[in-house]
Each structure stands twice: as C-alpha cells, then as structure tokens.
C-alpha cells in the first residue's frame, strides 16, 4: 500500500505539472532568483517536486550541485550533460491509516473532491493571469502546503481502497456462512424428524407388546377355567347317573362325588375378576407444549465469531460452531493520524518494495487499534475427550457443524489461544483401526445393534472422515447417473444407496437379490447376476453404519420379505433407480482413502441367559436404551475372525445421571438378560469349582519355632509366619512383577465367589495373595490376605484371577491365640493391651512355643521375646499379666522358678557368639580370618544373610549383632555427617569410612583396588557389600571406630561345584541364590575346625512347606550345582587358604576336571573327581570337550550286530541302537522320568554350545541331550540316545547332567566306501532313507572303526537281507568308491536266524475250516434324492473343505430313497427284520468275541472294526499299511472316517449286517474352489491346495447347525450344495473371508 500511496502522490504531482505546463507554456519563473526563462530555450530545470530553477542558480553556488531542491530539500540525481534531472528513486514513508483523525474517514470523499476542484480552479486562474512572484518565500510556503495536501490525499486514497476490499471480502464470507448455516438448519431438523419418527415406532411397539402380554394372561386364565368347568361337568354327569341308578352307588365313592359337586370356585372367579378390569390405553402427549417448543426452537446468534460457545444438544453431545475466516469491519478502526517525516535520502539503484498482500493491512490495523482478537479453542486429549458431552446446560438447540481440522494438535489437556487469522490447512491423517492395541479404550458411537454379540460401532475419532465421506458422496451422486433398467446387479457388488434410515447417500454391498420369477425364494445355485428390471427384492448392507435395508418393488406378484429379513429396514418403492446408483471407477478412486466406518463388535464372554431360546428382544431394547445416541468408551480385548471382542463402558467423566453403566456387559448380566460364558444358569456348582489355597503348614505341638507376628487383631486373635522360608520372598516378588504388567489386565474377576482364591492389591499398591471372605455389594469385595492375615474391602478393579503356580504354595499366615491368658476385665481386650502387644510383637522375630492345635488350625501359643536383654527369653504372655493388661485363665498354675537347677550345661551358641564378638581384636590388623572358631565348629549358629555374591562368597551376620550395627551406624553419622573432604593418598587394604550414595549411609570399609584416580572399589565389611565409589565419598577411619571387629563373615558353601564343566558359577546360580537368601534368617554349621577363609559352611533354611532344607542340596536339586567330594586337607597342608583349589595347568598339558553324577537309586551316590590329560592341540579343537561329561557310544565288540534305526540325520548319518542295549535304554528312560518329576521352576540360564542338559520332548518325556547351537530364543539340541536334532524353546531344557557314567546309546553310522551324488546326500535321498529305515530292524556289519570315539562308524547295512548301499546305488543316489563287490543280499551263512525265518510260513494252516472267510458282496450304497430337491443332512466326517461324508437326516427320506429288495444282484437273500442298524450293532456288540478273526485282507473287504471308544462298527479294508507289525487301514462305512488298526481289532462281519446300506455318503461340495492366492502357511498335509484355516472355518460353519443339501450331480461323483437354514450356502463364509473363491 505504500507503493500505491507513492504512486498516488506522483500522479498528483504530474497532474499539477501538466496543468501548469498547459497554462504557462511561454515561460517559467526561477524559484530562487525570480528571473523568467523561456521554456523553449531549455535554460531552466524543473524538479519532480514542482519547483523550477534557472541554470545560473543551479551552477553558481557549489552546494546546489548536489541535486538538492533548495526549497523542499528533495534530493535528485542531476545529469549536467542532458540538461534535465530525472528521479531515480522517490520514497515516501508509508502513511498508516491510524494517523488520520476519526472524522476524516467519514469526510474523506468530500474533502478530496473539494481539494481537486480548488486545485483545478487555481490552475485555471493562474493560466489566465500572469503574475510576477516577487517573494520566493511565499512560493515555497505554497509548495509545502501542496506537498502536505498530497500526503493526506495519498493516505485517504489508501483507506478507501482498503475499505472497498474489506467490504467485498465480508460480503463473500457472509454469503458462504449463510449457505452453510442453511444446510446445518436443514440437517438438524431432518434429525429431529427422524427422532420423532423413531419415537412413534417405539410407542407403537410398546403398545403391541403390552397388549400381547395382557392377552396371553387372558388365554392362560381362560384355559384354566375351562379345565375346571370340564371337571365339574364330568362330575355332574356321574352324579345324574347315580341318581337314576342307585345300584351303581356301591361301586363308587359317593361322599367324594358329593364333595366335588359342592366345591366352590371363588379363587378361580377371583382371578377372572382381578384380570378383567384393565385401564383403557391412552396416549399421553402434550402436543401444544411440543408445538410451542418447536416454534421457539433454535436461534440464530450474531456474536463475536472468535468465541467458542460449548453447548449441549439433545443427544448430550458437545458441539462448537467455529467460523475460521471471518473478519469484521469497524467504523472506528482509526484513532489518529500519526505524522511522520518523509525520509529525504536518495536511494540509488534499488527497486521499490512489492505491494503487501490483502491481509497485511488488516493485521496491521488490528495491531494498532487493540490486541488481536483471539478465539479460545479447548483442545482435549483422547483421555479427556469424554468431558465434552458434559459441558454446557442450555436447552436451546445450537446449529452446529462438527469439523475437526487439526487433529495433530489435539493432544493437550490445556486450553490454548489461537489468533483470529487463518492458519495453514492441516494435513490429512490416516485413522488407526479400532482395537489396534488390545486394552486401549476409545470413544465410539453404536450405529446398529442386532444383539449384544452382534453390533456395529463408529469411532469418535473418525467424525472428520464421516463428514468428508458425506460431502464426497453428495458430490459423486450429484454427478453420477441413476440406474438404468438394463444395468446388471451382482451379489457382493458395491453400490450407492440413498438410505431412508440414515437420510443420506451411503456406500453399500448387495447381500441378497430375489428375482421376480422365483416367487420370492432364490433357488440354490441360481444365478447371482440380474438386470434391474428382473429384481423384485434387494438387500443392501451399509458398510459405514452396519445396518441393512431391504428394497421391494411394488406390484410384482405377491412379493414379501422372508423371515431372514425381519430385523431389517423395509422400503417399498416403484423403481430401484430412484434410490440406487452404481459405483463407477472414478467414484471408487475418489473414496478409496476412506475406510469402512462401521466396525463389527461382540461383547466379551457373554451368552444369552437362556441358550436354547437365544437372545431375547428385551436384551436388544435395554442395550439400545443404554448406548443409543451417546459416546461410550470401548475397551478392546482382542479380535476373532474380524470381530472385535469388546466391552462398552461409561466414560470416566460422564454424568452420574447418564443411563450408561460402568460396564455394559456386567449390566446385562445383572439384569439377567445375559450370563457369562463360564456360568451355568441357576447352577450352584460354582462352590465345588472354587479355587482354594492349601492350608498353612503347622508346627507340631510342644515344639518351639522362630516366627514373625505379621498381623494383630487382639492377643487372642493374631497371625504369624514361620521363618526361614527360602521361596516366600521370591513368591511375593514374582507375583508383583507379573500383576503390575499388562498381562494382568486380562485376569479381571467379574463375579467373585465366596472363599475364591485371588490376587488383590493392598494400600501400598502391591499385589498379594488373598481370598474372598465377604460380598457386601456395591461392586465391593471383602478379602483376606492369606499370607499376612489382615482383611480389607476393595473394588473389583483391584482383584485379579490367580495363576496356578501362585495357588499351589500353602497359606503363610497362621492364626494364633495366646495361651493361659484372657482380658483382665473378662470381656474385651483393652486398647492399651492391644497396643502393648503390638509394640512387643508386631513385625518382630519372636520364639513361639506351640502348646496345642485347636480347631480350624488355630494355634494356642506362648511367645518369647528372643531379643530381650539377658541370657534367657522372656514370656510375652507373662509380661502382659505383670503389667496388668491381662489375667491368667482360671485353673492355670504359675510356673515355679524358685528351684535352681544345679546341672551345668554347655554355653549356648548365642553366648559363644557374644563372647567371640567382644573378644574380636581391632581392625588395624586383618585378624578376623585368623580368629579361633574351634568352639563354634559343627554347631548350629543362627545368622542373618546380608549379601550373596555367589555360592562361594556369602556374607552373614550374627543375629545378636543388630544392636551393635545400629550403634556403630549412629557413631558413624555423628562423626562424618558434616565432615569435609580432604585429599588423601589412598592405597589398597586401607580402612576408611565410606558414604553410600544410594542410601545416604556411612559404613566402614576397606579398599580392594584403585579403579582410576577418582574411583576406588571398597568392601563394606560390616554388611558384606562391594561397590565402586568416588574418592570424595571416602574419609579416614577414626581410631575409636577400628576397635570393634568386623560384623559380617564371609562364608562358602561346601560339597558343591558349578555345572557345565566350568570353574565359575553361572549368573543363573548366583541370581537364584541371591534372590532366595538375601535378608533371610538361616542357620549355618562350620565344617572345619581350623580357620579357612572364607568359612566353609552348610546353610539351612526352611522351605515353603516348613521343612528344613540344605541350601547346597537345594541348588543341586534345581540343577544349578553339582555335588563335589570334599578333599582332605592333609594332601594340601601347604596351602592354608583356598584349600580346595587345584591348579588347572601343569606344564604343557591342560587338566580337565570331569565331574560325574549318577541318579541311580539302586546304587549309593558316588562322587568322583577324575583328571585326564589331553594333549594341547592348537590346530584342531578336541571334539571330546564339546560333549560335556557324557561318555561316547559303546560299539559292540563283534563284527556284526542287530540294531534299530532311530534317526536319519540331515547329512545322511544313520543313528542306530544295538538290540542288546535296547532294554538298558528303556530302563534308564524310566528312571529318568521318575527322578525328574520334582524339578523346580528354572531361572534364566545362559546356555553354551556343547553343554549337557535334560530335554523335555514333545511327548512330555525327559531325555539326555546336549546343546548344538544357541539361536536367539531357541536352542538346537541333540537327543544323545536317539540321534534326533531339533530346535526347541529354552523352557524345555534343564541344566542337569543325567547318568554321565552311562555311554551314549545311539551309534552314528555311515555307509562304507559309498559316495553320495554331489558328495552330499540330497534332500530326496534323505527322505527315502527316512521312509525306508525309520524304526526298522537292520543288520550292521562293522567295516571300519572311527579315529575318534565320537566319530561315525563305517558299516554295511542290510534291511530284510537287502544291502542299503546297493539299494541307494540302484536308485542313482550314490556310487561306490571302489569296484569291490558289495553283496546285494546279506550272506546266508552269517546269521542262522535269517534262514530260520524263511521256513516259518506254513500253508497248511490256511486250509483249515476256521480260516475260511465267507464271500460277501460289497456294501449297498445310499442314494441321494433327485436334483433340485432340498433335503436335510448330517455331516459325519470332513476330509477337506470341499469333500466330506454326509448322511440323510430324515428317516423317511432315507427309507424312500434307499429301499432295497430282499434279494440283491448277487443273489444273497436278506431276511426282513424290524430292527434298524443301530439296534443290530448294539446286539452284536454284546457277543463280538464269538466272531472269528478276519483272515482275508483284500481291498474293499467288509468287516467289523473296533473304534477308539471300544465299540465295534461296520467297516471295509482300504489297504495294508505296515507288515511289521501287520496293520490295516479301514474305512468306517457309516461314518466316513478312516483308521489304521492292527489285525486283533478286526472281525468277520455277520451276514445280517450286510442288508443295511452304508450310511455315510461321500460327496463333493459345489459353488467354491481353493483360492488362487492364499496367505495361509499351514496346509492340509493330504490336501495341500487347502489351508488348515479353511478346514477349521468349515468345521465351525457346520458344527451344531441344521444343514440342508441339494444334489447337483450324481455321476461320476456325487456333488451337492450345502445350505444353512435352507437358504444360505455354507461356503459363502469361506468366500467372504478370502479362504475360497466362487466357482461359477
């Protein structure tokens, strides 16, 4: 605009110049000297400002050569050569509109006109009158006045231009807003009309429902009255007969008849009188009020458009109306005219700035007048989006248009301000599918409901997509042409429909077409394509709403919808073309980015309340009542077959008065409209299946145990825990880690039961084991924490189902009561008594003396304070009595302590420990390892385990050192809390005070090593912790703090060693030991009288069952350690420390220790340490090292032996087990199974290649194995005794060595002097070997022993006398290295058994009479009804999705189409019997053992075969599968299934059973075929063209449904089409899921 102002000023100057030039063409007057100069002479110079000077005035003064006008001081570039002075640049400062006074805006037009008229008059007057200007100053003042006027004119001109532009913009925007508002009004009132129509239908349905209920009651009462009337009529007839014939009275009870006649029917008549009065139904509606409300409904508000008015419409949804591009024109925008001085500097060689955009003046003006107008936009995150429906309470209807424009910015809960001018348009964001993350809640709208397990929702976040879709659909349908009667419609095709229910154009899919010629029933296998003019009914599914609409043409026969269309919207119209449009390619391209908005859902784990009757109508009504027209929170649990498994919940910030329950699923169950899948209706069997804990393990009576009191209600009602449990803390930690993760979300308990075991969250937010002890209601549950004894009331959200592994450990909390005492007031325990008892026992270790075990496992105990000062424990029971807080029970005799015992007892371990601690020497010398512990040798010493690093480094503290440790800590804090760091030269083994940064504690320590100049590694020897700290955390240890000895001892477990052949303990063993022992109370026993550092000890604790266990044996049992025989110290007397250390390197040889463990229960466990010297080979790694401690296979000491082939390796290696070793292998496997039943839960373990292990196979049996390769989360292992190699998960391995003294049973073999083609056995050759040799008995001839005991044995192998090498060479799989002859058959003379076997077969037995089998005809085949006839069938057996066995469901149909005469084609005559096949089979099953065995195994031979259920059924022989042992494949002709049976399960069939035709009919299904592209990886092995997913889906489609079939062809194969409920082809489910293609 500044440029426009400048141009305006220049134009005004040019105008003046031209006018003056026209009037004064003869000459001009010099402004400086007044001399007149002729214009034609050219001796004058005129400046752009209008002033003229003669050439003399410009040249004379030196300062005027700078091109400066002397009057107005405007600089101008002067060219003396050309004789004139052009303007290269002329810049005026931009005059802003705010510089003008307010009145000038209104009067600018008139002032401008006056100024222009006055200027023209002055110029005309000057042209006619030539006056001499004698005063140059006057001329200059006039010139200045003109310049100032031009400036003002330029500003006014700019203001007028801006005003016009603003008015044009406002005019356009107002029209757009009006148009948009008009559309919104129409849309809202259409919604109101639809709501009124829906309410009308609802009222009509309610009236009909109530009338039907009333009429049904009338019918019931009427039938009851009629029955009474008929009874009375019969009695009256009898009485009349007796009256006319007195002789008959003796044959009946006359008294009873008279009593019956006199009976009154008051109760029956009262029912009539009570049910007949009925209030006449009437319609209660206030139309006048509704009309009045409609007349004032809605209003158009003209408010500040930059504000947001959150309101609430009738549906309870928050809407906002935002006008983004609106601008206002204010009359008082400009307040004053700011006068600015024009910059007179001359710009050289610069172009003027381009004009600003149209929006720039508006922003500039708004900034000058006031702060920019801003609109408040409340932006919410998905978590708080449910707040929106609660804002506002105005009853007015607000015209709305919901358009979310910037979804990416809507992720903050704080309101933000945005300026009024437009922003950059947002980019489109692809919406994520519903339920992409299981458990992630999302707001949705329910769009259509069929029943609670079949409904559709639309995402709240897809409102923008819905709005865009509606606009695009309107655009597409406005441009597209309607259907033509000749257009072809096809089932499954996309189509656009003008939905009556949804009141808009919608996308749809054609799901049903009924042509007008078929009388409303489309026949099976009929065409799926029809022209529009041939269709009488069409059903369309709305993919964006979930509902279906049925369109019916009027006047075409008696067209009416079938029962399958009852729940759909029906529209009757004269022409489909009015509501339908075909989907064209350009429209598909336009809509392809918008996914289907309706998502199919089902409520999780609920079924109809009455499964036999299905979902009641009331369930759908209540469902709609709770979710209709409101946003609800949907929680997704998973997805099954494209159906989201969900629960609809109330948004957390929704109104309390809302109809939406907290959980829709629970609400339907509560209203008895549904039940959970695991429930049985009205069944009380839940109590029998309630999960319960094992009762706590109680100590024996009259024993003393160490316990901790965990919860106290009173001194006669408290709970305690037995101490020294290894796994209890681990159990608590495992429970917390599992349930605090996401896995616990799917274990919610919806209907808790009394005494049900569960896991519950406590006040500290941690999960503990609990059980339900009360159900107070209001979705609250009272639970008891079974490991602590306390109770609490919690909500269902703080409960979870308990896993089996957490259910097995018994309860830890034992209920107790103090013995001998009772409340002092004999009523209740006083508050002071409870507090004192808690003070003495709560969360403390005490000694418990069990007096008696009462009922319900309550212990009667006496507690002793084991921490009391002195040498003897004090009874807490007696203390309560002494302090007056309790009294002894009546009859209790006080203990007599007056007698002093004269016996002298050995000092207790506690006294010895106290004495040792007091006698410890100062720490100035490293004295503790050299202390004399002879007095403690082989005694049980209670300790607290403070830190575990490995089994050979465990730090313990004496129990009595706790007070010393606390006292020492107080001294350390007092000495070093406020101390300052001083530089000290630290060295190894120096003592120091260490500040532990993590705990802010001061501890004594000793420097182990200098890590860097700033970091040192120290040992906190009072607690046994090693850590690296900065030297700024160290202080010099004061001398008075060195007098007290170390408070922790370093110990090492004896008699165990690491697994895996290594000298280092695995991380798994260390972590497991640390997890179970750290912080536990245990007992140690010193194993050596002489001091060895660390102290060799045995550690004992109590496990979950309360049994005392040796920690060393515990590690061995877990497979984390191996037993080691203790070495006598006499042989290593020269080494007082590390006495068990054995050098591993001696000279040039490496010593390998091989530890052997035998689990043989019949032998005493022998622990040996063997040392084998193996030459140090740098070039080749020894293979014996990779096998761990197992021995190589033992090759029989013969040239040939019989064996069984167990496995064929991938490289062609043949693994065999000698027949002589087979029994030993079976025996060892049995022992392994019995010994490995009690393996515990395996902790994380780091596997290494070659490590021995125990493998749990797929048959759940344990095998010896070794690790071949570690690949990610799986491990490739080899079964040592069978040769198999496979990849299995780590959870199926256990690090344990099984029977190391037993050699490997299977021997790897290779064919002697046989080369496979290509030097490696090809895959087809491997397959042939596997098929030929697996589990086969063979003869092995040893030709060459391997160089290494683990190598392959070179052999000749013979199977059934045939040489395997010759066999493989004959089939071109291998060649021979040499031309030496290889026997084609096994030499006869080498094995007598081979010759004997050839003479075992005797033909005489086959001629015996009992071996004769009757000649029987084949089974009669069942026939199907003729084509195009629908008949009921049952599916007996499924071979593949398109091949199965069926039988006729109706017995009449079966008899009609399968009636055979008494004599068949073979001449065999059947006796007609009345019994059917089932009855005949039941009769023959009773004496089946009398039937002769089957001797004729020819194909198609009829027989009786034993099924898996132990019953015998009709069958026929298919083929012989195996000869050793003989097994036959048979087909059960009445069921269609096949099975491989041994001959002892086959019998000759009685002739009487041959008269019945085979029930199972083999058919092929028509209408579909395998898909061309199937992503399913798992195929059916015997039918690879079909996937397993397709097979399972077909089974689901057929199971439990009434099926019908229609025959398509009966020769050469029987082909049928299978239907569900006579209409829907079953294969359509596979086609819709993409598991099959249609076969036209």
Curated annotation (Swiss-Prot):
Source organism of the structure: Mus musculus (Mouse)
Zinc fingers, RING-type, are found at 30-73
Oligomer status and interactors: Interacts with MXD1, MXD3, MXD4, MXI1 and PIWIL1. Self-associates.
Q: Basic and acidic residues composition bias: which ranges? A: 360-373, 1170-1184
Residues that bear Phosphoserine: 134
What molecular function does GO assign, one term?
A: identical protein binding
Protein's gene? Rnf17
Q: Which GO terms describe its biological process?
A: spermatid development
**Disulfide pairs?**
none
What are the record's GO terms for cellular component?
cytoplasm; nucleus
Effect of gene knockout: Male mice are sterile, exhibit a complete arrest in round spermatids and fail to produce sperm.
The record's section on PANTHER family has: RING FINGER PROTEIN 17
Q: Where in the cell is it found?
A: Cytoplasm; Nucleus
Tissue-wise expression = Expressed at high levels in adult testis. Expressed in male germ cells (at protein level). Expressed at lower levels in adult thyroid, submaxillary gland, ovary and epididymis.
- Keywords, alphabetical: Acetylation, Cytoplasm, Developmental protein, Differentiation, Metal-binding, Nucleus, Phosphoprotein, Repeat, Spermatogenesis, Zinc, Zinc-finger
PTM N6-acetyllysine: list the residues. 229
Q: What is the lineage of its organism?
A: Eukaryota, Metazoa, Chordata, Craniata, Vertebrata
Q: Where are the transmembrane segments?
A: none
Region (Disordered) residue spans: 348-376, 413-435, 1170-1191
- Domain (Tudor): give its ranges: 751-809, 985-1044, 1246-1303, 1496-1556
- Alphabetical list of Pfam families matching this protein: TUDOR
Output this protein's name: RING finger protein 17
Q: PROSITE patterns, alphabetically?
A: TUDOR, ZF_RING_1, ZF_RING_2
Function in brief: Seems to be involved in regulation of transcriptional activity of MYC. In vitro, inhibits DNA-binding activity of Mad-MAX heterodimers. Can recruit Mad transcriptional repressors (MXD1, MXD3, MXD4 and MXI1) to the cytoplasm. May be involved in spermiogenesis.
- Which superkingdom, per the lineage? Eukaryota
């Amino acid at each position: 605009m500044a440029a426009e102002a400048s141009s305006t000023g220049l134009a005004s100057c040019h105008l003046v110049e031209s006018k003056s030039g026209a009037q004064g063409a003869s000459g001009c007057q010099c402004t400086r000297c007044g001399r007149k100069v002729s214009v034609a002479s050219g001796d004058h110079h005129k400046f752009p400002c209008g002033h003229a000077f003669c050439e003399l005035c410009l040249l004379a003064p030196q300062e005027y050569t700078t091109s400066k006008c002397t009057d107005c001081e405007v600089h101008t570039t002067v060219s003396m050569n050309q004789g004139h002075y052009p303007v290269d640049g002329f810049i005026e400062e931009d005059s802003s509109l705010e510089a003008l006074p307010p009145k000038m805006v209104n009067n600018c037009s008139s002032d401008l006109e006056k100024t222009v008229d006055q200027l023209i008059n002055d110029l005309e007057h000057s042209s006619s009158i030539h006056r001499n200007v004698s005063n140059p100053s006057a001329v200059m003042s006039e010139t200045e006045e003109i310049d100032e006027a031009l400036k003002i004119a330029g500003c006014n001109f700019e203001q007028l231009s801006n005003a016009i532009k603003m008015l044009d913009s406002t005019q356009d925007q107002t029209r757009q807003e009006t148009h948009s508002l008009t559309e919104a009004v129409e849309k809202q009132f259409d919604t109101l009309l639809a709501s009124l129509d829906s309410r009308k239908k609802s009222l009509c349905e309610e009236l009909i429902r109530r009338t039907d209920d009333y009429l049904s009651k009338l019918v019931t009462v009427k039938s009851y009255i009629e029955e009474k009337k008929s009874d009375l009529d019969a009695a009256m007839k009898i009485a009349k007969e007796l009256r006319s014939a007195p002789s008959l009275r003796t044959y009946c009870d006359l008294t009873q008849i008279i009593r019956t006649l006199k009976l009154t029917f008051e109760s029956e008549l009262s029912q009539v009188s009570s049910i007949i009065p009925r209030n006449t139904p009437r319609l209660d509606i206030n139309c006048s009020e509704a009309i009045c409300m409609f007349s004032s409904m809605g209003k158009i508000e003209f408010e500040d458009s930059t504000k947001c008015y959150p309101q609430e419409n009738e549906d309870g949804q928050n809407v906002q109306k935002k006008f983004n591009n609106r601008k206002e024109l204010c009359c008082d925008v400009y307040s004053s005219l700011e006068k600015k001085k024009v910059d007179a500097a001359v710009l050289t060689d610069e172009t003027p700035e381009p004009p600003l955009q149209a929006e720039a003046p508006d922003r500039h003006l708004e900034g000058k007048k006031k702060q920019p107008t801003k609109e408040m936009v409340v932006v919410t995150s998905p978590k708080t989006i449910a707040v929106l429906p609660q804002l506002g309470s105005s009853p007015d209807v607000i015209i709305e248009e919901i358009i979310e424009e910037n979804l990416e910015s809507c992720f903050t809960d704080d309101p933000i301000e945005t300026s009024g001018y437009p922003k950059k348009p947002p980019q489109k964001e692809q919406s994520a599918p519903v339920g992409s993350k299981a458990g992630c809640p999302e707001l949705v709208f329910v769009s259509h409901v069929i029943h609670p397990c079949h409904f559709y929702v639309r995402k709240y976040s897809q409102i923008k997509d819905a709005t865009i879709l509606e606009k695009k659909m309107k655009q597409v349908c406005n441009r597209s042409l309607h259907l033509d009667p000749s257009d072809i419609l096809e089932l499954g095709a996309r189509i656009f429909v003008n939905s009556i229910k949804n009141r808009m154009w919608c996308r749809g899919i054609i799901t049903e077409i009924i042509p007008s010629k078929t009388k409303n029933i489309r026949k099976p296998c009929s065409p799926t394509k029809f022209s529009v003019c041939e269709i009488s009914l069409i059903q369309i599914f709305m993919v964006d709403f979930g509902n279906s609409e049925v369109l019916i043409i009027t006047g075409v026969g008696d067209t009416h919808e079938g029962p399958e269309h009852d729940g759909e919207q029906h529209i009757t119209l004269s022409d489909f073309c009015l509501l339908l449009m075909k989907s064209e390619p350009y429209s598909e391209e336009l809509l392809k980015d918008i996914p289907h908005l309706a998502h199919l859902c089902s409520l999780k784990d609920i079924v109809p309340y009455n499964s036999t009757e299905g979902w009641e109508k009331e369930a759908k009504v209540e469902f709609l009542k709770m979710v209709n027209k409101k946003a609800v929170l949907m929680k997704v649990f998973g997805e099954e077959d494209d159906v989201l498994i969900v629960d609809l919940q109330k948004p957390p910030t929704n109104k309390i008065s809302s109809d939406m329950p907290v959980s829709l699923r629970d609400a339907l169950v509560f209203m008895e409209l549904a039940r959970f899948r695991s429930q049985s209706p009205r069944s009380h069997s839940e109590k029998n299946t309630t999960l319960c804990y094992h009762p706590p393990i109680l100590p024996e009576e009259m024993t003393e145990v160490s316990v901790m009191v965990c919860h106290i209600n009173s001194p006669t009602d408290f709970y305690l825990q037995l101490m020294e449990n290894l796994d209890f803390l681990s159990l608590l930690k495992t429970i917390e880690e599992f349930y605090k993760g996401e896995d616990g979300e799917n274990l919610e308990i919806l209907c808790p039961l009394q005494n049900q075991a569960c896991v519950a969250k406590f006040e500290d937010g941690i999960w503990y084991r609990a059980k339900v002890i009360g159900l107070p209601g209001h979705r609250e549950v009272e639970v008891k924490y079974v490991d602590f004894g306390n109770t609490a009331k919690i909500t269902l959200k703080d409960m979870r189902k308990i896993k089996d592994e957490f259910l097995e450990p018994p309860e830890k909390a034992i209920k107790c009561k103090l013995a001998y005492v009772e409340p002092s007031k004999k009523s209740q325990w006083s508050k002071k008594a409870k507090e004192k008892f808690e003070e003495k026992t709560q969360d403390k270790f005490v000694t418990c003396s069990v007096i008696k075990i009462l009922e319900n496992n309550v212990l009667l105990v006496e507690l002793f304070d084991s921490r009391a000062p002195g040498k003897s424990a004090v009874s807490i029971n007696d203390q309560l009595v002494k302090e007056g807080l309790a009294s002894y029970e009546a009859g209790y005799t006080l203990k007599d302590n007056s007698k002093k015992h004269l016996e002298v007892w050995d000092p207790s371990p506690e006294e010895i420990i106290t004495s040792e601690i007091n006698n410890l020497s100062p720490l100035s010398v490293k004295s503790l390892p050299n202390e004399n512990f002879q007095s403690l040798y082989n005694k049980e010493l209670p300790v607290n385990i403070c830190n575990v690093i490995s089994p050979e480094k465990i730090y313990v503290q004496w129990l009595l050192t706790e007070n010393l440790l606390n006292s020492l800590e107080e001294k350390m804090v007092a000495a070093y809390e406020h101390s300052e760091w001083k530089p000290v030269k630290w060295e190894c083994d120096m003592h120091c005070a260490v500040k532990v940064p993590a705990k802010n504690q001061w501890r004594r320590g000793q420097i182990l090593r200098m890590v860097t100049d700033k970091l040192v590694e120290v040992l906190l020897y009072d607690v046994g912790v090693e850590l690296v700290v900065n030297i700024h955390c160290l202080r010099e240890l004061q001398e008075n703090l060195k007098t007290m000895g170390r408070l922790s001892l370093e110990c090492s477990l004896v008699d165990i060693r690491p697994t895996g052949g290594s000298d280092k303990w695995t991380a798994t063993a260390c972590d497991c030991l640390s997890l179970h022992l750290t912080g536990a109370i245990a007992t140690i026993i010193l194993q050596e009288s002489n001091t060895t550092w660390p102290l060799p000890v045995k550690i004992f604790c109590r496990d979950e069952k309360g049994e005392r266990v040796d920690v060393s044996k515990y590690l061995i049992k877990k497979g984390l350690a191996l037993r080691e025989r203790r070495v006598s110290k006499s042989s290593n007397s020269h080494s007082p420390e590390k006495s068990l250390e054995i050098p591993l390197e001696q000279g040039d040889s490496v010593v390998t220790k091989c530890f052997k463990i035998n689990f043989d229960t019949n032998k005493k466990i022998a622990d040996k340490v063997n040392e084998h010297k193996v030459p140090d080979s740098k070039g080749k790694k020894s293979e014996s090292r990779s096998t761990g401690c197992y021995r190589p296979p033992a090759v029989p000491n013969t040239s040939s032996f019989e064996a069984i082939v167990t496995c064929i390796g991938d490289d062609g290696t043949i693994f065999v087990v000698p027949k002589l070793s087979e029994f030993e292998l079976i025996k060892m496997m049995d022992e392994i199974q019995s010994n490995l039943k009690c393996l515990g839960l395996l902790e994380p373990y780091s596997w290494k290649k070659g490590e021995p292990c125990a493998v749990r196979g797929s048959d759940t049996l344990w095998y010896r194995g070794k690790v071949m390769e570690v690949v990610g989360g799986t491990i490739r292992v080899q079964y040592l005794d069978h040769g198999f190699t496979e990849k299995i998960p780590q959870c199926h391995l256990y690090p344990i060595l099984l029977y190391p003294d037993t050699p490997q049973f299977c021997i790897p073999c290779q064919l002697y002097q046989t080369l496979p083609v290509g030097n490696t056995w090809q895959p087809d050759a491997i397959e042939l070997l596997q098929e030929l040799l697996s589990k086969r008995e063979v003869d092995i001839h040893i030709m060459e022993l391997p160089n290494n005991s683990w190598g392959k044995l070179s052999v000749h192998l013979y199977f059934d006398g045939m040489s395997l090498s010759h066999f493989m060479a004959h089939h071109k799989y291998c060649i021979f290295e040499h031309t030496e002859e290889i026997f084609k058959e096994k030499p006869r003379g080498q094995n007598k058994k081979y010759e004997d076997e050839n003479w075992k077969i005797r033909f005489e037995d086959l001629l015996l009479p009992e071996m004769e089998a009757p000649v029987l005809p084949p089974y009669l085949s069942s026939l199907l009804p003729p084509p195009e006839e629908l008949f009921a069938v049952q599916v007996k057996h499924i071979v593949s999705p398109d091949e199965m066995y069926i039988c006729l469901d109706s017995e009449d149909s079966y008899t009609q189409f399968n009636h055979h005469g008494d004599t068949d084609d073979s001449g065999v005559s059947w006796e007609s019997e009345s019994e059917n096949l089932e009855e005949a089979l039941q009769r023959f099953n009773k004496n089946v053992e009398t039937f002769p065995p089957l001797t004729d195994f020819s194909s198609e031979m009829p027989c009786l075969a034993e099924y898996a259920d132990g019953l015998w059924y009709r069958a026929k022989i298919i083929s012989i599968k195996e000869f050793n042992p003989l097994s036959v494949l048979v087909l059960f002709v009445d069921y269609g299934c096949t099975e491989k049976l041994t001959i002892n399960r086959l019998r000759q069939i009685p002739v009487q059973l041959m008269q019945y035709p085979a029930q199972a009919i083999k058919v092929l299904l028509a209408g579909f075929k395998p898909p061309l592209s199937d992503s399913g990886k798992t195929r059916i092995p015997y039918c690879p063209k079909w996937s397993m997913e397709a097979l399972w889906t077909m089974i689901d489609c057929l199971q439990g449904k009434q099926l019908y079939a229609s025959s398509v062809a009966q020769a050469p194969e029987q082909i049928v089409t299978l239907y569900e409920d006579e209409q829907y082809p079953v294969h359509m489910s596979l086609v819709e899921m993409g598991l099959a293609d249609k076969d036209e």
